């Protein structure tokens, strides 16, 4: 399969094969953990827990990318943390498997963001997305072999239109 972007370079040309692979290896379980957390806890709690991502990304960016934290970013992080605490109300939220899943998902997603930033210096967005989707499709297929349940015809219709409208909306971004 040969896909080309607008600059006529092949999309799969990269010097970061291991990073793309690692990104996908972390991205898929991150999503699976988050979706599992949504089943086990209210959506507002899972979403509030996911707001820890900017804090983790900032710490990782300082440690691994050498980025600096300036006063405005620090202020925004503190406000975000306060907002997260208001939503979660520490002491009231029950610590459960869902909470741990949401936290693990957030940590993995933070690493994915850092890896993406390092790859984005050399690879185009299309290359990053192509590798991510290719690897995740392969990994998802392997998982599906063990857990596949054929959707009903009505569900297939819904999925078709969700894909169609999602693709149309995303294509409008590039017009």
Where do the language-model regions lie?
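Structural motif at transmembrane-helix junctions in multi-pass transporters
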Residues: 33-50, 121-126, 172-173
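Transmembrane alpha-helices of multi-pass small-molecule transport proteins
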Residues: 4-29, 108-112, 131-146
């Amino acid at each position: 399969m040969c896909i080309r972007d607008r600059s006529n370079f092949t999309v799969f040309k990269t010097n970061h094969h291991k990073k793309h692979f690692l990104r996908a290896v972390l991205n898929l379980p991150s999503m699976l953990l988050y979706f599992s957390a949504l089943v086990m806890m209210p959506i507002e709690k899972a979403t509030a827990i996911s707001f820890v991502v900017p804090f983790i990304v900032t710490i990782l960016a300082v440690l691994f990318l050498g980025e600096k934290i300036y006063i405005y970013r620090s202020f925004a992080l503190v406000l975000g943390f306060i907002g997260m605490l208001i939503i979660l109300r520490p002491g009231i939220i029950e610590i459960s498997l869902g909470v741990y899943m949401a936290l693990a998902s957030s940590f993995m997603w933070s690493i994915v963001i850092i890896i993406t930033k390092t790859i984005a210096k050399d690879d185009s967005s299309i290359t990053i997305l192509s590798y991510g989707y290719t690897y995740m499709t392969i990994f998802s297929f392997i998982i599906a072999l063990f857990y596949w349940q054929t959707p009903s015809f009505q569900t297939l219709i819904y999925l078709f239109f969700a894909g169609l409208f999602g693709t149309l909306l995303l294509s409008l971004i590039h017009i």
